């Protein structure tokens, strides 16, 4: 991977309906966005990391912290559309879409995400982690099922696969919202209209699957907590404080 120019982009909007201004909410005394940026830089695998936002409040935060940021249009339909705006002005081989609500990312997550690009046919990658029992029916925890070769078959907020006979299936996998794209695949995503399933599930990655574009799902060690609610915020804060000890 050292020969590839990998650019990390953190799409950061403050219009979240479930947890308004969540990327700027404080966790252990620092805005969540600062934790995410630091985690991305600590991976050691991204040549550059920058914030992409449509909010002046986020731009001001970046200026105060000395973090690279770029202003993107408000009408971007998804985080990946925002990454594509960045790609039009900054060249790279691989673009990593880093969710601004994942402050618990570690270098191991980035290693797992980027390793599949050693295979030339891989165009898009993302991650899965074990799904805990209390997350299986939680629509905020997106489940993923894959083919034997790691290609994603489907992502859903519903419980997939459905254990019809209650046989005690224990292999549920949760999607971790970290994506990496070769430039051509990123362009293809951004030039396609939002798809039917994408709009139903509110999951941008379904735009690729509905249009026949493979997503390689790498299995990552451990799990994280994506911050969608006040409860998530408190749980992440406790875990990050313990990690700092």
Swiss-Prot record:
InterPro entries: Cytidylyl_trans, KdsB, Nucleotide-diphossugar_trans. GO terms for biological process: CMP-keto-3-deoxy-D-manno-octulosonic acid biosynthetic process; lipopolysaccharide biosynthetic process. GO terms for molecular function: 3-deoxy-manno-octulosonate cytidylyltransferase activity. The keyword Nucleotidyltransferase applies. Belongs to the KdsB family. HAMAP family: KdsB. This is 3-deoxy-manno-octulosonate cytidylyltransferase. The lineage of its organism: Bacteria, Pseudomonadati, Acidobacteriota, Terriglobia, Terriglobales. The gene is kdsB.
